[in-house]
Amino acid sequence: MMTTTIFLFSITSAVAIIFALAAHILPTRNNDGEKNSPYECGFDPLNSARLPFSFRFFLVAILFLLFDLEIALLFPLPAASFLTHPTTLILISLAFMAILDAGLVFEWINPPLEWAE
């Protein structure tokens, strides 16, 4: 068991070192204006790509990622039913869903998420 772990750790470390050395040794490409410009479906960009975008859009994107992560954390719960007592699993699931619901209610009530002013 321990020799397998040491062997796999050695192999992954060697591969990581080889990739790091290859990235350092291989030449970098020349950066020209075309490579550094944003691509917009073959059209010339109308505005600068470095303009700030709406903070509300950023907030909605972050909230979407948080809810997506919370839903992804719910997926292993059916597999955990074989590992723990069913009552414990139900309590954990209910607590997790309560946190998810509380976050949804907070975001629903929170004024920064309203688009119309």
Curated annotation (Swiss-Prot):
What's an example GO cellular component term for this entry? mitochondrial membrane
Gene Ontology MF: a single term:
NADH dehydrogenase (ubiquinone) activity
Give TM regions. 6-26, 57-77, 89-109
Instruction: Report the main location listed first in the record.
Output: mitochondrion
Instruction: Report keywords, A-Z.
Output: Electron transport, Membrane, Mitochondrion, NAD, Respiratory chain, Translocase, Transmembrane, Transmembrane helix, Transport, Ubiquinone
Q: Name one Pfam family in it.
A: Oxidored_q4
Q: Where in the cell is it found?
A: Mitochondrion membrane
Fetch the InterPro entries from UniProt.
NADH_UbQ/plastoQ_OxRdtase_su3, NDAH_ubi_oxred_su3_sf
User: In the Enzyme Commission scheme, what number(s) does this protein have?
Assistant: 7.1.1.2
Membrane topology per record: Multi-pass membrane protein
Q: What class of enzyme is it?
A: translocase
Catalytic reaction equation(s):
a ubiquinone + NADH + 5 H(+)(in) = a ubiquinol + NAD(+) + 4 H(+)(out)
List cystine links.
Answer: none
Under Gene3D superfamilies, the record lists: NADH:ubiquinone/plastoquinone oxidoreductase, chain 3
Role summary? Core subunit of the mitochondrial membrane respiratory chain NADH dehydrogenase (Complex I) that is believed to belong to the minimal assembly required for catalysis. Complex I functions in the transfer of electrons from NADH to the respiratory chain. The immediate electron acceptor for the enzyme is believed to be ubiquinone.
Family recorded in the similarity comment: Belongs to the complex I subunit 3 family.
Protein name as annotated:
NADH-ubiquinone oxidoreductase chain 3
Name the species this protein comes from: Paracentrotus lividus (Common sea urchin)
Taxonomic lineage of the native organism:
Eukaryota, Metazoa, Echinodermata, Eleutherozoa, Echinozoa
What is the gene called?
ND3
